[in-house]
């Protein structure tokens, strides 16, 4: 009877050990990502200033920290709708530029500017390349909240785009609020930002929402 009880006790403890191992693994992963974000933000603040953190990609980088710790489908969904498509395009443009050795769309031109410190370009690649993978992983783990993802991204853009225009400059062109790429708009600021907002909603947010809702809806 003693042997049987010991075996039963050992068998029952195995799931507990597995859960503890998973919790420890998740904790290490969350701490590592949080530390990485702290380092990136510190570098950005030193070299670019706080305004650079208004880029949608930087908002997603930082926003993923509470999304991970809270295991929040809501936060992950809003961030994914807002930046997943642009981040995928960034990676495609960057990869093709490396492979073809020629300018493709211009989206990642700054990554090949020799006058830009290599450290800044390396750090940029280290967060832009894995960011869409992280967003997709969170959606797979936590699910996609379709009721919040799209309206949350729309609200985020409604706040961030006018703010970016107000504190940016044609040279910084944060979130393209002064023109797409190197092209500068001649439209009045309010009208252009409104059109840019509509473009994000219609061409980025809605298609992304529909795709994610089909793939990851909880």
Give the residues covered by each predicted segment.
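Membrane-interface transmembrane-helix boundary segments in multi-pass integral membrane proteins
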Residues: 166-207
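Short, hydrophobic transmembrane alpha-helix segments
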Residues: 42-50
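Alpha-helical transmembrane segments
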Residues: 26-39, 201
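Hydrophobic, membrane-inserted alpha-helices
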Residues: 35-41, 58-67, 131-137
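Juxtamembrane boundary at the C-terminal end of a transmembrane helix
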Residues: 210-218
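Membrane-proximal helix-loop-helix units in multi-pass membrane proteins
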Residues: 80-85, 89-155
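Aromatic-anchored segments of alpha-helical transmembrane domains
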Residues: 36-42, 84-93, 156-166
């Amino acid at each position: 009877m003693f042997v049987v009880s010991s075996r039963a006790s050992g068998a029952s403890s195995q799931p507990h050990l597995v859960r503890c191992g998973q919790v420890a693994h998740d904790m290490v992963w969350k701490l590592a990502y949080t530390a990485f974000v702290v380092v990136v933000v510190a570098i950005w603040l030193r070299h670019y200033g706080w305004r650079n953190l208004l880029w949608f990609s930087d908002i997603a980088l930082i926003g993923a920290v509470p999304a991970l710790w809270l295991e929040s489908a809501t936060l992950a969904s809003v961030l994914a709708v807002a930046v997943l498509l642009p981040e995928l395009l960034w990676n495609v443009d960057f990869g093709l530029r490396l492979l073809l050795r020629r300018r493709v769309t211009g989206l990642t031109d700054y990554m090949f500017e020799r006058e830009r410190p290599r450290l800044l370009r390396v750090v940029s690649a280290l967060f832009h390349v894995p960011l869409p993978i992280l967003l997709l992983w969170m959606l797979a783990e936590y699910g996609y909240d379709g009721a919040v993802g799209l309206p949350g991204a729309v609200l985020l853009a409604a706040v961030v785009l006018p703010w970016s225009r107000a504190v940016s400059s044609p040279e910084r062109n944060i979130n393209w609020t002064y023109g797409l790429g190197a092209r500068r708009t001649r439209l009045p600021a309010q009208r252009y930002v409104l059109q840019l907002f509509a473009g994000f909603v219609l061409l980025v947010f809605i298609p992304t929402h529909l795709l994610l809702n089909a793939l990851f809806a909880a």
